[in-house]
């Protein structure tokens, strides 16, 4: 009798454990990637005061890990040194894309590898007051040297994003020049950056 009870207990325990394991959602691995030479051209007209800038923003999707031409399926977009997010509203910038997602961003000063989680309260969206990633030398992700006309990413500036569909990513911009070569100004407006993308809904950790 005791043997029968033990067998029944084992069977019931196995079924319960198996049922629980099926209910638990298996998490996807956090994705770490590097993008090289993403071209973000712009046209500047210096005949006006102040000079005007035009050109399409180059849209990027973290889920696919690449450039997209889709007007709605994008997370961030680049033009020159400006980075837009697909969330909030228009800033009034010429040629900016329409926002139709819930993307947002903030900048944190830290070592890229040490930024392991998201601070929800820090997120900002684009709007009439400006871009979530501030523009201008020293305000956001870069410094501009007026003597050399070079743009340099600020060491320790990590860009944290909420994507258009509510997932999370962090970005470390390595260079603004093609093949990481700032010696020729013709190489400007080519982004190279590391990013980590959290592909699991509701997960805010980058580990």
For each feature predicted by the language model, list its residue ranges.
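Surface-exposed, beta-sheet-biased, low-hydrophobicity segments with strongly acidic/polar composition
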Residues: 21-207
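Sec-dependent signal peptide recognition
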Residues: 3-10
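Basic side chains
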Residues: 2-3, 22
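C-terminal motif of bacterial Sec signal peptides marking the signal peptidase cleavage site
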Residues: 16-19
């Amino acid at each position: 009798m005791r043997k029968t009870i033990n067998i029944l207990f084992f069977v019931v325990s196995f079924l319960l454990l198996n049922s629980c394991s099926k209910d638990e959602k298996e998490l996807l691995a956090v994705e770490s990637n590097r993008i090289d030479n993403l071209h973000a051209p712009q046209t500047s007209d210096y005949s006006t005061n102040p000079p005007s800038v035009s050109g399409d923003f180059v849209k990027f999707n973290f889920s696919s890990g690449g450039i997209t031409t889709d007007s709605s399926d994008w997370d961030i977009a680049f033009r020159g040194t400006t980075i837009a997010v697909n969330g909030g509203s228009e800033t009034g910038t010429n040629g900016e894309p329409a926002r139709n997602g819930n993307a947002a961003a903030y900048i944190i000063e830290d070592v890229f590898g040490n930024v392991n989680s998201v601070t929800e309260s820090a997120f900002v969206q684009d709007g009439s007051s400006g871009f979530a990633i501030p523009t201008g030398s020293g305000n956001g992700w870069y410094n501009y040297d007026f003597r050399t006309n070079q743009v340099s990413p600020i060491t320790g500036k990590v860009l944290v994003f909420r994507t258009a569909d509510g997932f999370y990513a962090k970005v470390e911009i390595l260079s603004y020049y093609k093949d990481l070569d700032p010696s020729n100004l013709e190489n400007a407006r080519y982004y190279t950056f590391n990013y980590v993308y959290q592909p699991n809904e509701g997960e805010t950790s980058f580990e």
